[in-house]
Amino acid sequence: MIGNERHGLVGVIGADLIRNAKIPLILLVAVLISAVLVVTTAHRTRLLTAEREQLVLERDALDIEWRNLILEENALGDHSRVESIAIEKLKMQHVDPSQENIVIK
């Protein structure tokens, strides 16, 4: 007698799904896997975007530092240019410390 047997509801539903609904079950698993992959891809994209922003800020800071170094190099180059003009055109020369005269009022 079939009527006297007791089956668990979960077992009956599971057996019915496996027996009659294989394609929808496979599609459900595929959708779940796809959803997990979408979430992980979005997370990685956010992390990479944040890292890229940090690198852009670092690049900008390095660019500003490079420009300041170029300005400093040009300023130091101008000093040597002034010194060479003073020596060549004005016939100026460096004075030894022993030849210096200090005037005090």
UniProtKB/Swiss-Prot annotation:
Keywords (A to Z) from UniProt: Cell cycle, Cell division, Cell inner membrane, Cell membrane, Membrane, Transmembrane, Transmembrane helix
Pfam family, one: FtsL
Keyword Transmembrane helix appears in the UniProt entry: yes
Periplasmic membrane side: 44-105
Transmembrane annotation, as ranges: 23-43
GO BP terms, alphabetized: FtsZ-dependent cytokinesis
Role this protein plays: Essential cell division protein. May link together the upstream cell division proteins, which are predominantly cytoplasmic, with the downstream cell division proteins, which are predominantly periplasmic.
Compartments, as annotated in UniProt: Cell inner membrane
Residues in coiled coil: none
A GO cellular component annotation in the UniProt record: cell division site
Native source organism of the sequence: Yersinia pestis
Stated family: Belongs to the FtsL family.
Cytoplasmic-side positions: 1-22
Origin organism lineage: Bacteria, Pseudomonadati, Pseudomonadota, Gammaproteobacteria, Enterobacterales
Domain of life the protein comes from: Bacteria
Membrane disposition: Single-pass type II membrane protein
The keyword Zinc-finger appears for this protein: no
Principal location: membrane
Classification via InterPro entries: Cell_div_FtsL
Record's subunit section: Part of a complex composed of FtsB, FtsL and FtsQ.
Protein's name according to its UniProt entry: Cell division protein FtsL
